[in-house]
Amino acid sequence: MKRGFLLGMLSVCCLTAQAGPQINVGTVYDYLDADKSTYLKRVFNSGDATAFVKVNVLEIIYGADGVPQEVPVQNAADGASRNGVMASPARLIVPAQGMQGTRLLYMGERDRERYFRVRFVPVVPEKEDEFVVSSEEREDYKNSLSAGVNVMTGFGTIFFVRPKDARFATVINDTEKRYELRNDGNTVLIVDEFKSCSLSKESDCGATTKHHVLAGKTFAFDKEKGREYRFFLIEGSEKKSMKTASR
């Protein structure tokens, strides 16, 4: 998976307003296991005003060149349902210091892994936004946020939908100078809390990073003399502590 894609999870939406809602959606990455079809995502509001939140879903599709594109979720062949993920409800009213949840529902075949961008965008409600509030309530809300400057931050998360018959098959090639971890399975695996540290000075460590290795892809790095590399390999519900070094 492209590094830029992994780092580009957060999107910021700036609006003019006084002290208001401050939402948080928890983890940036979520996973729908092979035996599940729904996932509860919670939205928290630590601010001092109600948050009106739109939930938008796009599918992430990789081209032949490996570059991801975000496209609208398509309808199924019968036209009566979606072929992918939908959020229910797609509009949330989250009270100050409160929490609300939306269910991410997957509909369609599970013969391969699929990826979705789920955006949680706080807005000042308008009539066309389909929030169940009256015109008077909308105006009162706008007036309460009209006396200063505030930043309302929206979040974009990544939702991995594993195939029905999820299979993990990790192949490791560890040599003196290079380490390669190849995903020969059919679903994403995670290299978590990856960092390198000096063998002679434990406090000399690099940044801690997280990597998603898609099916058929490889995570690899060149090993430097005198450094040890540590991480957790996560395959579904299994988590293994891994390390390698070049002495």
List each language-model region with its residue ranges.
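Short, solvent-exposed loop/turn segments enriched in Ser/Thr/Gly
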Residues: 34-40, 100, 113-117, 175-177
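Beta-sheet-dominated interaction scaffolds and their linkers
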Residues: 20-49, 165-174, 210
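Intrinsically disordered, low-complexity Pro/Gly/Ser/Thr-rich segments with frequent PxxP/GP/PP motifs
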Residues: 73-109, 202-228
